[in-house]
């Protein structure tokens, strides 16, 4: 198991009996080979290692597809895993309450505009509906004002004048530096809540929502536990 900042994975990371197989971006092929696995599961960041890992054992590639939507991707991934272990009947119960929770969020988001941003290295990058945080502008129903842009990796750097000009009802913020534990970085609030942003309706109405578990949004999107946490962040922020 590689090191992690995800709380619900810490017990595995800290378990000395579980072998460290590398990072989320680079597998330790020698360590994987020593484990003699029957099957290997990988996510999007390890896609370049697919061929090398396939020489060790069959590889199951699990990723999110923004064309299908995050929730459908999570369900599809869960069903793929469940089918391998004969646990198909478990998936529906695990996914059962997500639809109702999203419907409740939609009662708030209906007719509301939003900007979805990521703070990184002192900058504020805007995210569309084609990558990270797409849950907000797709399933959750907010009208993401930068939805049409291609922002699938780290978004497009934005000026705060643009934020003021678009004047959304809500601003959602993911703190990338916090997610990856960047030493000495400014926190998201220091970056976002400047004199320009304080003139927006979102600020005046207390509608700037800092996603509490940025590490989950940034590195763990695509799993059932991650989706539960992400929806909880939205629910708490929208109270």
Put a short name on every predicted segment:
Residues 3-4, 48, 62-80, 113-135, ...:
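Extracytoplasmic ligand-binding site segments that recognize negatively charged/polar headgroups
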Residues 135, 153-180:
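Ligand-binding pocket segment of bilobal, Venus flytrap-like solute-binding proteins
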Residues 90-141:
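Basic- and aromatic-lined ligand-binding clefts that recognize polyanionic substrates
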Residues 72, 83, 92, 170-239:
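Structured C-terminal subdomain patch of bacterial secreted/periplasmic proteins
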Residues 1-34:
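A short, structured surface patch at a secondary-structure boundary
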Residues 29, 33, 47-50, 54, ...:
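Extracytoplasmic/secreted envelope proteins and their assembly/folding machinery
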Residues 7-14, 128-149:
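Ligand-binding cleft/hinge of the Venus flytrap
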Residues 36-42, 58, 163, 167-172:
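Proline-aspartate-enriched helix->loop->beta-strand connector
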